[in-house]
Amino acid sequence: MSQTATVKPQSPWSPLKITTFRYLWLAVLVSNIGSWMHEAGAGWLMTTLTTSPVLVALMQTATSLPAFFILLPSGALSDILDRRKYLMAGNIGMCIAAVIIGVMTLSGLITAWSLLGLTLLLGIGMAMIMPTWQSIIPEVVPRTELQAAIGLNTLGMNVSRVIGSLLAGTIIAASGSGAVFICNALSFIFIISVLATWKRVPPVTQLPPERFFDAVKTGLRFTWHSPALQAAIFRSIGFYFFASVMWALLPLIAKDLLQGGPLTYTFLFAAISIGAIGSALLLPKFRTYLNNDQLITVAALVFAVALSITALVHINVVAMLALCFCGAAWIIVMTSAQLAAQTALPNWVRARGIAIFQMFFMGSLAIGPVIWGSIAEITSLPTAMLVACGGLVMASIFTQRWKISGNDNLDHTPSQHWLLPQPKLFIGAQQGPVLITVRYEVAKPDLEDFLREIKLLGSGRQRDGATFWQIFEDATNPGSYMETYVVATWLDHLRQHERISKQDALIQQRIRVLLQPGTVPLVSHFVHPLVL
């Protein structure tokens, strides 16, 4: 049953009523326009600096490759440091790189290799801040506006791509690529100014920040033990791995299937963008009838049918109309999957979780095109498109086992109900490992319910930092259970007290109800001695 059947549709523009989000959204829009202008200008300039196809192709690699290596570390830094200051530093660095590219180009000092290297720096800067931009959205909009806010972000991305490409072409024709690079540098000024005036309220904590490598491991551990985040990742992979065939083969669709030229390619690209923009505006209306799981499934089927029509009917108007539906489906899945990832993550690990989600997303877009291009080369272009569409249909059915609609109901707000332990020993912050045991006396009729709830609690312990968790039954006293878990240091255990959510607190309440009357959980802490 659809959980959204009686929900009143939100206005897609409602998050813009929130002043902080409005200014951040406009600033990101302007910055993205500048980034798309740089991509167009740099690509054109490289063709005038070298005749090497490899160097020209490496421009795209320089923009996207850093994400594979930097997303997770940058997510860890974003969760450790102040996100506002981190974003400011990243944008200032990219602004400086853009100024250098512009000045070198205008002065005639730019070379193919220097352009490639400086573009790589911009790519690194973008990868450094990508998870942070996504992770601050829930900080500036209420949960009820999160879907619309993510939709506006995807809308802004597509609008900036169209505007940036058009402006770049006009400016290159009038003044050359150097002027485009200067415009890109200027686009950072607005976003830096907005960040400088944003009065962000950092999360309240009495503990020092995590160490970098520990933060990375914690992010990976959280993902491993978070079915909600895994569901968002699997649904995303199930769509984008196969749907990437559209972007991979779009130039060949224009040239070979439709027997067109650059203008045909431009029209096809515009059709995809129009569909994407339209669906972003209509998505709140769609959500009144379908939940996120249903939206992704329907969008995948629409994409498969529309792209199959493009592969079989080689008529320009038909192809543009079909690709318009493909663009709409693409954005529906992107917005729904991103919302599922956002709602699966508490604030303390949000940037790391978003970074891991984006790594799988970008990995699908990187690996998929290689496969579809190879199939097209071995067989034919329509065959590759139809194989991908068939795979997409099967994947949309197979991945339905991972439900994401329930993520909307998760409450990651810190419960603050768990009192800090009061040890009689002196325990250093980095002393460990630490073993925690909790004894439960369970009534026999409630045993099955207890084991189900304790397993859920164990997943929460591991998401919050436990490196080991297990439940044991006393062989000499049936019904007496010992929960044991290990954390690396005493400080990590104190962080667990800060991180435990209202969702996990409800699980603990349900467990208490299942215990024998007159008993309560008995907690003990054991720490590795400083000297052996």
Task: Indicate where each model-derived feature is located.
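Helix-loop junctions on the cytosolic side of multi-pass membrane transporters
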Residues: 135, 139, 181-211, 289, ...
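Small-residue hotspots at the loop-to-helix junctions and early N-terminal turns
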Residues: 38-41, 45, 50-60, 151, ...
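Short amphipathic alpha-helical segments
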Residues: 445-469
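Transmembrane alpha-helix termini and helix-breaking/packing motifs in multi-pass membrane transporters
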Residues: 43-50, 102-107, 163-183, 252, ...
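Juxtamembrane intracellular "pre-TM" segments in multi-pass secondary transporters
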Residues: 2-21, 200-234
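C-terminal transmembrane bundle of multi-pass solute transporters/carriers
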Residues: 59, 69, 73, 80, ...
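Substrate-agnostic recognition of the 12-TM MFS/MFS-like secondary transporter fold
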Residues: 20-40, 62-78, 82-97, 114-173, ...
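An amphipathic, aromatic/His-enriched active-site/gating alpha helix that lines ligand/cofactor pockets
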Residues: 405-408, 459-468, 486-522
